[in-house]
Amino acid sequence: MQWQDEAIILGVKRHGETSVIAEVMTPSRGRHLGMVRSGRSRTMQPVLQAGNRVDVIWRARLHDHLGEFRIEPLQLRAGQLMETATAVYGVQAMGALLRLLPERDPHPHLYQALDVILDNLHDPVDAGELFVRFELAVLNDLGFGLDLSECAATGLRSDLIYVSPKTGRAVCRTAGAPYAARMLALPAFLGEGQSKAADPESLAAAFRLTDHFLHRHVYDPRGLNENAARDGFVQAALKALERKAEPPALDKAV
């Protein structure tokens, strides 16, 4: 058995004295594991850092075997991903999200999204919004997608400001008003056709939205704890956006 694909490194584990088990995300094979011989060598260690894009050849006697990876670098961006807190936490948090999906289950659009986000994690302002959309995409692929296109009660497609915490469907201002205290906020930047950028308040609301449904549908039913990297990422992204929103300091007169 053999296949070749490009991949993004999600992480590695030691295997014996010199080898590692590498975990990668591929466009056509999904999340996949494989042994890398001499993976702890000085040559391979920089290549096998999380976030790097690589070329992978997988070989095994049978399809369900662990198999071996032969890996060549395509884009080494791990160094850049260590420059900001959002990038450091973000690459770990996205890896944890992808581990919620079955191994070897292809999700090509998630691979493409991961690749784009990794190229933009160095910009802490954009990183938060991209990460929220990634969480929504993972929820959708797990079968728990949110419907933010129209009001669940009236069918209206405008003035959508709430999300039902039970159904994950959008609710308009009028229909949701009597239940506002129990509703989740729908940030404007997540609405269909919206081009408005996130501000600190709306980004915080978006993080609360995805956190609620990840716990409701995934973490709690599976008895899982939320990955600590997400908390670090959320805090770093909000701080970065708050700094951007601050008015520029006036130069003191000489």
UniProtKB/Swiss-Prot annotation:
Protein name: DNA repair protein RecO
Task of the protein: Involved in DNA repair and RecF pathway recombination.
Keyword Cell cycle: no
GO biological process: DNA recombination; double-strand break repair
Record-linked InterPro entries: ARFGAP/RecO (IPR037278), DNA_rep/recomb_RecO_N (IPR022572), NA-bd_OB-fold (IPR012340), RecO (IPR003717), RecO_C (IPR042242)
NCBIfam families for this protein: reco (TIGR00613)
UniProt KW keywords: DNA damage, DNA recombination, DNA repair
Organism, as annotated: Agrobacterium fabrum (strain C58 / ATCC 33970)
